[in-house]
């Protein structure tokens, strides 16, 4: 097929208008290439304007681009490398390596970033808990294998640290492959994540094929085209492991809000009329197009964990609200919990999971979780009385509830492996069995004689007991 060649007629920020004289217009979502000061710039066709002109969105900076430059139509959408050759490497939205290492061994083994979601008869619907080693999640809002998890939280409450801990724990516990999409987040965090993965052995720099993770970055400094499409590029790599290798893959997105934000920027640049709060009119469609591909099939599964920034802590904002419809579990991070010094700062009562039922988790786990939530809920309803009248005015039974609730809150904290460098405390992976046993003792009153401080930042109940003894000795 002959290559269509056009010329740039207009450049406005990240949007570029290209005129094709010979009448063969590139299709919507086709990739175009252009030389920009010795570097290949990728553009993606977004609109056909008539008179042989298409409006395309740049995947990198358009600085230095001039009119009359030659643009080639590749005849296909953006394609990225797939397979084990991607392990241990960092890619950008168009599949170029950005970690300074050598090229991929099979440059022709690529896939288009657009794919149809699996058919209904190909999808699988089994319910099984994915053990994370994080007490508050495993007990009160457990993740399901092949499910979608949303991490909701405002700025600076610990979404990225929680994601990094999950990658670390799951790589060690399951040895499965993970794909991480850095969508519009800080470049420094992306660099920290890579360094920590190298240190913890999740990435093997000497033998990348032995690594357990692929990183795909489109960070804050990138134009909106890259931020809007980078999640698709990463998902394409995850789909290959699921469909062709039958793997159970973990797909991390940090941050899904930036995907929506980039879509809103593009929508405005392309002249679409905005909808509520200035978001794009196609918000639900864009989100559904990405989310419907993240699913489990009879071959393998993709379990996704998506950090969702909540603008101004308003959970009803259209961006986080649109994500809710697609999720199986929600882990809500709270500023109040973070201010109390309890990390991970998970709001135990606001977080939820569809698999929190005796049929999936077993009777014991379900009952302990419900009792813990009951005590925390009672404590929450007593807080107004305590604030006005003080603890002395409570009945003995209510006092006991308050003491237990405070111990539960402290015991829900946990030192993280990835935060060791900041806290100086070694991280803890707590098995589900130990988590259930520990909280069962707490709700049954077997720990009523132990001081509150003994439960703060420990792993299992044995560690809390050892800490209680050392506190008494002091």
From Swiss-Prot:
Positions contributing to ATP binding: 153-160
Gene3D superfamilies recorded: 2.40.10.170, Bovine Mitochondrial F1-atpase, Atp Synthase Beta Chain, Chain D, domain 3, P-loop containing nucleotide triphosphate hydrolases
CDD domains found in the cross-reference section: ATP-synt_F1_beta_C, ATP-synt_F1_beta_N, F1-ATPase_beta_CD
Domain of life: Bacteria
GO cellular component: plasma membrane; proton-transporting ATP synthase complex
Sample GO molecular function, one term: ATP binding
Catalysed conversion reaction: ATP + H2O + 4 H(+)(in) = ADP + phosphate + 5 H(+)(out)
HAMAP family cross-referenced by the UniProt entry: ATP_synth_beta_bact
Assembly notes: F-type ATPases have 2 components, CF(1) - the catalytic core - and CF(0) - the membrane proton channel. CF(1) has five subunits: alpha(3), beta(3), gamma(1), delta(1), epsilon(1). CF(0) has three main subunits: a(1), b(2) and c(9-12). The alpha and beta chains form an alternating ring which encloses part of the gamma chain. CF(1) is attached to CF(0) by a central stalk formed by the gamma and epsilon chains, while a peripheral stalk is formed by the delta and b chains.
Name this polypeptide is given: ATP synthase subunit beta
Native source species: Neorickettsia sennetsu (strain ATCC VR-367 / Miyayama) (Ehrlichia sennetsu)
